[in-house]
Every structure is written in structure tokens, then in C-alpha cells.
Design a protein with these regions (language model features):
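Short, Lys/Arg- and Gly-enriched loop/turn segments at beta-strand edges
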Residues: 36-44, 63-66
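Conserved Radical SAM active-site core
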Residues: 63-67, 71-217, 227-256
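PDZ/PDZ-like peptide-tail recognition elements
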Residues: 1-8, 20, 46, 54-59, ...
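Conserved PDZ fold ligand-binding element
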Residues: 21-39
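Hard-cation-handling environments
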Residues: 240, 247-278
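Terminal peptide-recognition signature
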Residues: 19, 27-30, 55, 99
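Short, structured beta-strand/loop micro-motifs enriched in basic residues and often containing a Trp
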Residues: 6-15, 35-38
Length: 278
């Protein structure tokens, strides 16, 4: 468990639920279940599945209630919390040369500027994560709760190049976490955002070759061209791909698709639709 103290404020109670019967009210805090601090929604769902549980609730006046509950294994308590994840979203620690959010115009709604890099959102919403802020504790929970598939933004398997592209000196070492997930039997999907003159050409071939080592748990890898907008003042200089560039990229991908299909019976590496539209 992390050093952070987790107190989950009750937002609402379902009428006729176990929670209502026990006198739990909006504004109360859930402190623990069976003596275990609850980090997020995954801990909560795991512990409330038991037929016999003990809740520690702190009322709004500070009084703590220990509530012993007997219920059916699949019966919910009827508690809704203020945050769907029951925790803060984890933000990105990178400064990627290709970051699309950095290229957005001003004046849009605040949520569009939030850079998430949260493995839990990868499971819940299909978001891609870079692994740079994933701790050993996070990996253990992913394996324990089978939070799969995890969608990973690889960009490259060259550690030095990955550090450069993500502008994070830990980005290369973060690739070792893929081994942990693989050893834990976790299914994954991958993505490579291709930047002209950076991770294409021989580097793309290296990445595809390296990633085949994780088949069958790494189910697929998509290759997409970097998205560039006109709002790039002060950002890393990147050139857009041309039609001829797209032909070269597709040639590499199709070559590896044939090789991988012959060996594994799957295509594995896939080109984004954008390549065919250039």
C-alpha cells in the first residue's frame, strides 16, 4: 500500500440498500473494509464481494462505526462515491515530443488539457499508458486483480531513443515493466506513434522485432503517424509524413505482418488508417 491515506466520501446511498439499512449517509467516510485500507474502486469491488465483511465508517461528527455485514456474494452495498475511480487520476510525467495536448489551442474546456497516464484508465477506458509512473505496487495490483488488457504506448524499444522521445530519463528503464506484466500473464496491446526521422525506418523494424518476444500476451501493436497541428510554437520540430513516407512505412509493416503470420498465425502489427489516406 502507498503512504497516502485514503478516505472515501460517500456521495449518495441507493434506496433500500444495505448501506441505507445500516444508517450510512452522504458525507460519511469509508475508512476500511476488513481492516484493509481501500485505495481505489478495484480494492473496493474486490473486498465487497465477500459474503461477510466489516466496514469502518467515519460519521460526519467524527464518530467511527464498525459495521459487520452478512450478504450474498454478488450483492452490492448501495454506496456511491464522489469519484468514480475512488482516487485521483494520475497525470503524465513525460514531455513527449509528439504530445497532442501540447498542440491544442487555448480556450477549450479544462478536461481536454489533462494528460492522464493511469494504468487503471487503461483497463477501464482503453487509454494508453507509457509505464513511466507505474510503480511495483501498481504492477502487483494489475496482476492480482487481472486488470487486463493493459494498453501500452511503446513508441520504440530502444531505451535511449525512448528517453529522448518522451523527454523522461526513466522512459527506457520503464520498458522492463513489460517483462513483469508478461511474467504475470497479463494481456497487453501496444501502440507506436511514429515520428519522421526519429523512430521510423530501422528503429521501427527493431521495435517490431523486439515486441514479437511478448506474443501471445502482447496481442497487437498499432503504428500511427504523429498528429501535428498548427499550434506548435516552441515545441520539438517534427516533419509531417508524405505519401512516399507512408508507402515506406506500410512496406515495413506488411513485411513484418507476413513474417509474424507465418510463425505465429496472427498479423500482430497493424497500420493505422491514416497511412492509407496520405
Amino acid at each position: 500500500m502507498t503512504g497516502k491515506k485514503h478516505e472515501h466520501i460517500v456521495k449518495s446511498i441507493m434506496p433500500g440498500s444495505i448501506a441505507e439499512e445500516l444508517g450510512i449517509e452522504p458525507g460519511d467516510k469509508l475508512l476500511s473494509i476488513d481492516g484493509q485500507e481501500i485505495e481505489d474502486i478495484f480494492d473496493y469491488q474486490f473486498y465487497v464481494e465477500d459474503e461477510e465483511i466489516v466496514l469502518l465508517i467515519e460519521k460526519q461528527d467524527g464518530e467511527q462505526w464498525e459495521l459487520e455485514i452478512e450478504k450474498d456474494a454478488d450483492e452490492q452495498l448501495g454506496i456511491e462515491f464522489g469519484q468514480g475511480l475512488m482516487d485521483e487520476y494520475r497525470s503524465c510525467r513525460n514531455k513527449c515530443m509528439f504530445c497532442f495536448i501540447d498542440q491544442m489551442p487555448e480556450g477549450m474546456r479544462d478536461t481536454l488539457y489533462f494528460k492522464d497516464d493511469d494504468s487503471r484508465l487503461s483497463f477501464l477506458q482503453g487509454n494508453y499508458v507509457t509505464l513511466t509512473n507505474m510503480s511495483d505496487h501498481d504492477i502487483e495490483r494489475i496482476i492480482r486483480y487481472r486488470l487486463e488488457p493493459i494498453n501500452i504506448s511503446f513508441q520504440t524499444t530502444n531505451p535511449q531513443l525512448r528517453c529522448k522521445m518522451l523527454h523522461n530519463r526513466f522512459a527506457g528503464d520503464a520498458l522492463k515493466k513489460v517483462d513483469r506484466l508478461f511474467e504475470g500473464g497479463i494481456e497487453m496491446n501496444g501502440q507506436i506513434v511514429l515520428c519522421k526521422g526519429e523512430n521510423d525506418g530501422a528503429e521501427l523494424e527493431r521495435s517490431i522485432k523486439d515486441l514479437t518476444a511478448y506474443i501471445p500476451l502482447l496481442r497487437s501493436v498499432s503504428v500511427v503517424p504523429v498528429g501535428l497541428t498548427k499550434f506548435r510554437d516552441g515545441l520539438y520540430h517534427l516533419e509531417p509524413f508524405t505519401k512516399e513516407d507512408a508507402k515506406e512505412v506500410l512496406s515495413v509493416i506488411h513485411k513484418w505482418q507476413d513474417r509474424i503470420y507465418e510463425q505465429y498465425g496472427i498479423h500482430f502489427i497493424h497500420a493505422g488508417d491514416e497511412w492509407y489516406l496520405l
